[in-house]
Amino acid sequence: QADPAELGAARDAVTRAPDTPEPPQETSVFMSVHNGLHRNLRTYLLGLLDARLGNGARAAQYARELEAMPTPSDAGSLARDLAAGIRAESAARRGRPAEVTAAFDGVLRESWYEMAAASPFFGQPRERFVQAEALAAAGRDAEAAPLYRSLSGQGSLFELPYIAPAQLRLGEIAERQGRADEAAEHYSRVSQLWRDADAPLQPLVREARARLAKVRGER
């Protein structure tokens, strides 16, 4: 869990950020992918941070503002998708997985491949993970699994932080469905990926190792 003081400081920093910074001269998609979107992304980040801080009413207002903002023609469904992400985060903070999944109903995640690869906002790995967590919590493993599998690091570098947690969840799904060999593969990957992780992440590694020992004993 993030420190509320850190979240508050981040929100203050985003509040002070300009809506329309000078665009870079670079034409590479990695440098220009957010051109014309800074006001939209600033609104999204403020909404997300307020949701994380438990300021649900303010987060909902940011979501509405985001949906009403104009976006470039090549932005696809970005504004609607990110507004859904704000609402889902608010629901997740209140421990309401059904509301999380409802918030994501109708999400399209339409974007060019290059834009999704170059931007965490277009690629939406965080939103995919939040949606998968809610589906798994509701017992909807068949819907959660493809979202977890999509967080492989092959689509974007921004998926990398989610690979190990997604692998743990895929292992749990396989274990629940009686596929011990597959579960063991997922748990082993968690241990390999995060064996040298920082101390706050080690509980996840220990859980994966404990589950690995359990399923190996069941085979």
Q: Could you tell me what each predicted segment is?
A:
Residues T15, R149, E175, A180-A199:
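TPR/TPR-like (Sel1-like) alpha-helical repeat modules
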